[in-house]
């Protein structure tokens, strides 16, 4: 048996397990066995499985925020290409976990707050980029950036849950953005970054 797994190690291993198998499929026994510790040790650090999963979700959110900040700091490209980079980052994020995990987190009430905060963060980022595109007349004037961002994110998630492959989702986003673009916007989307 391992001596004294750290809280960070427990969170890291649990994150890997729930990302690969979904929240419901992972049992506390499996987590303890994988770490080589007793369930009692786990329960000394986390009140229950939900507390442990919440800690994992917090760590995942933190990591995703860092990725978005890094994406935002990348220079180069026009505003629509930046929207494409952000949507690609969102898509890549959805593929870091199994579709069962996405389904579990969106349905379990106890994790609703984590799910909502995560979606709101992505939606806000995407809306900001889309607003910039509208202001620069790269998107059609009738595009409502918040509604467009929300609908695009919902559609991407639904397609991911239904087994659409990553490259198809990327092509879908590019096609949707081209359809929402002005002539100038379409030219910029088609330009190589």
Give the role of each language-model region.
Residues 1-21, 25-34, 51:
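Basic, helix-initiating cap at the start of DNA-binding domains
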Residues 36-46:
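Short hydrophobic/aromatic patch on the recognition helix
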Residues 55, 69-96, 149:
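Hydrophobic alpha-helical connector segments
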């Amino acid at each position: 048996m391992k001596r004294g797994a750290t809280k960070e190690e427990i969170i890291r291993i649990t994150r890997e397990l729930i990302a690969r198998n979904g929240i419901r499929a992972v049992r506390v026994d499996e987590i303890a066995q994988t770490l080589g510790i007793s369930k009692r040790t786990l329960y000394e650090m986390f009140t229950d499985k939900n507390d442990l999963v919440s800690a994992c979700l917090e760590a995942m959110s933190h990591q995703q925020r860092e990725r978005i900040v890094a994406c935002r700091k990348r220079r180069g490209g026009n505003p629509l290409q930046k929207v494409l980079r952000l949507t690609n980052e969102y898509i890549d994020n959805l593929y870091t976990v199994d579709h069962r995990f996405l389904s579990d987190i969106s349905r379990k009430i106890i994790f609703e707050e984590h799910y909502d905060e995560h979606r709101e963060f992505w939606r806000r980022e995407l809306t900001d980029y889309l607003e910039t595109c509208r202001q620069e007349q790269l998107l059609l004037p009738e595009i409502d950036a918040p509604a467009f961002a929300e609908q695009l994110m919902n559609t991407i998630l639904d397609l991911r849950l239904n087994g659409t492959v990553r490259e198809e989702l990327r092509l879908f986003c590019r096609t949707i953005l081209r359809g929402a673009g002005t002539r100038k916007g379409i030219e910029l989307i088609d330009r190589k970054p």
